Amino acid sequence: AGVLGRNWLDYLAMPELCRFLGMIITMYYDDHAPPHFHIRYGDYKAIMGIDSLMLLDGYLPPRALGLVAEWGALHRDELWEDWSLAEQRAPLKKIKPLE
């Protein structure tokens, strides 16, 4: 099941890393490879790879996609740190929003 196949309650349980311009960035604990983060924007849901900063699943409108990719590029090291913490089920660190 892709991102759209997950139960809405699963998304509520994901730690929030950041929120900006109506977008909510989250990450699951013990999630599957490749390393990635989840984006919610209104009714849209998507998964973006940390390395590629390309969508792995779901959809975002083009402007939102560009903004999330820009944010991801600026905070890639912090995303990797949170991915590592999530693998250890340790508390995740908040990341600054896009300014």
Region annotations inferred by a language model:
Residues 2-99:
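Basic nucleic-acid-binding interfaces
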